[in-house]
């Protein structure tokens, strides 16, 4: 194996490892999208009901999004979280202080919720199914797992290439990384489109702002790393095979 190809192979492996770590961290964390709003310092009856609805198993899209808006919510692929006061005061609001303790409460999406239809008017089951948002939601949480699976399968093939001391299997590894990058890019695109469509239907309150979080950024960084790793794997395999063919033809001649 030529030193150039070995160097390209090692660099591609490093890029692949980094992108896999980023993708796994992105899938496992809850900061794809974050909302910023004034923290509700008191725990009135209405606030308690909102928290219970948010943490319930049957919360619809409109219900949990309204709570996310009001309580500094964060949204991941599998969980939704809100920030609420740690100490509740049912009789009266606490005195205003410079800071107070808060706690984060999270609720996981069930598989039924992940595959549940989205409605034209969120929360209104009689408004008809919004097919675009429904399939965008399903793709945004399925594609990252497909991407991660392709990366792991490509790593196994790369390991076989090392054992066989051959660069030929790395062509398949490169193709798998290319497909993984496309899946990651598709997931990010679906997530952005889904968030924008949601905010067109459910407007944010005036004192609430939203932004993409660091989990989303990790997924965005992972995609180009996968593409670069794929390019190096494919280049190393293709060029090495081409030089081997030329060398074989020269020896025959």
Curated annotation (Swiss-Prot):
Kindly indicate whether the keyword RNA-binding belongs to this entry: no
User: Localized where?
Assistant: Cell junction, Tight junction; Cell membrane
- Which cysteine pairs are joined by S-S bonds? none
Instruction: Describe how expression is induced or repressed.
Output: Down-regulated in the cerebellum following cerebellar hemorrhage (at protein level).
- Signal peptide segment: none
**Glycosylation positions in this chain:** 42, 72
**Keywords assigned:** Cell junction, Cell membrane, Glycoprotein, Membrane, Tight junction, Transmembrane, Transmembrane helix
Topologically, how does it sit relative to the membrane?
Multi-pass membrane protein
Name the predominant localization. Answer: other
Query: What GO cellular component term, any one, is given?
Result: apical plasma membrane
Q: Where, by tissue, is this protein expressed?
A: In the brain, highly expressed in endothelial cells of the cerebellum compared to other regions (at protein level).
TM ranges: 5-25, 141-161, 175-195, 216-236
Q: Return the similarity comment.
A: Belongs to the PMP-22/EMP/MP20 family.
What this protein is reported to do is described as:
Plays a role in negatively regulating the permeability of cells to small molecules.
The entry's free-text remark on domains says: The C-terminal region is required for localization to tight junctions which occurs in a TJP1/ZO1-independent manner.
Query: What is the name listed in the Swiss-Prot or TrEMBL entry for this protein?
Result: Claudin domain-containing protein 1
The taxonomy runs: Eukaryota, Metazoa, Chordata, Craniata, Vertebrata
Gene of origin? Cldnd1
